[in-house]
């Protein structure tokens, strides 16, 4: 197991690290200088759970998150290989190069794939993210809305991205935001669904750090490879969009 140590990770994960070590689990701290934000659990090199949520039970009942069980052999092999590389690599200030696979979008090289998905949208783009701050993503959403793509975004309110919300709203995106009450639904899920057929889902928030610096992983799925997953994400997004207050 690799546990994040950067930002507030060391403090958050210290108790778990000690408990796992005491149980003879091979657990290792990620390098201090890099945020390891990837959320995966790989079992027997046959199945990888790829998620948007942290393994922190206090948030299970109030956070919107999702996990996808991936049994594609190429995906699972690449996820396992990248884990092995991360586990053994010496600290360098940047995550090692990940093992590529067609359905995987790795950070720190994720931004181009995210922009491509948005730029290729013809009819619609639906977005949830804990954060909305990356300049290039904002520009892509702005352009999509202005060319007539139906752009919908669901967030939890936060002053840190109020200007971003105002910008994409002015371009034509419809942004619905849940109030940050501490007890109501908190949007932590990270998805981009385009034309109700192509889905990015995983750990990347729409921030520059998340897309270009951290270790992160999202799946790139569609209605041919994972129709049930896409349908479930679409249905859940529609429900959250309807429930969250609009402008």
Residue ranges and their predicted role:
Residues 1-48, 53, 57-88, 95, ...:
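PLD/PLD-like phosphodiesterase catalytic module centered on the HKD motif
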Residues 93-104:
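Long, charged amphipathic helices and adjacent flexible linkers at domain junctions
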Residues 103, 107, 129-130:
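Glycine- and other small-residue-rich loops at beta-strand/loop junctions that grip anionic moieties
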Residues 107-118:
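Glycine-/acidic-rich phosphate or pyrophosphate-binding loops and their flanking alpha/beta elements
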Residues 121:
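An anion/phosphate-binding loop that grips the pyrophosphate of nucleotide cofactors and donors
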């Amino acid at each position: 197991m690799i546990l994040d140590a950067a930002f507030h990770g060391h403090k958050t994960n210290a108790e778990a690290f000690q408990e796992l070590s005491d149980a003879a689990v091979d657990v290792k701290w990620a390098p201090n200088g890099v945020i390891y934000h990837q959320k995966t659990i790989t079992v027997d090199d046959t199945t990888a759970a790829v998620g948007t949520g942290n393994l922190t039970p206090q948030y299970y009942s109030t956070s919107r998150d999702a996990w996808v069980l991936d049994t594609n052999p190429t995906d699972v092999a690449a996820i396992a290989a990248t884990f092995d590389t991360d586990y053994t690599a010496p600290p360098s200030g940047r995550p090692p190069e990940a093992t590529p696979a067609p359905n995987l979008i790795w950070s720190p090289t994720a931004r181009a794939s995210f922009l491509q998905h948005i730029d290729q949208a013809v009819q619609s783009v639906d977005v949830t993210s804990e954060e909305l701050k990356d300049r290039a993503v904002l520009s892509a959403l702005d352009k999509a809305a202005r060319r007539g793509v139906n752009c919908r975004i669901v967030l939890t309110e936060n002053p840190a991205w109020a200007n971003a919300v105002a910008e994409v709203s002015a371009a034509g995106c419809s942004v619905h935001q849940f109030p940050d009450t501490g007890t109501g639904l908190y949007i932590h899920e990270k998805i981009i669904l385009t034309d109700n057929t192509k889905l990015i889902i995983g750990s990347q928030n729409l921030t520059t750090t998340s897309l270009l610096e951290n270790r992160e992983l999202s799946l790139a799925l569609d209605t041919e490879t994972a129709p049930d997953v896409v349908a479930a994400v679409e249905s859940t997004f529609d429900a959250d969009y309807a429930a969250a207050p609009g402008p």
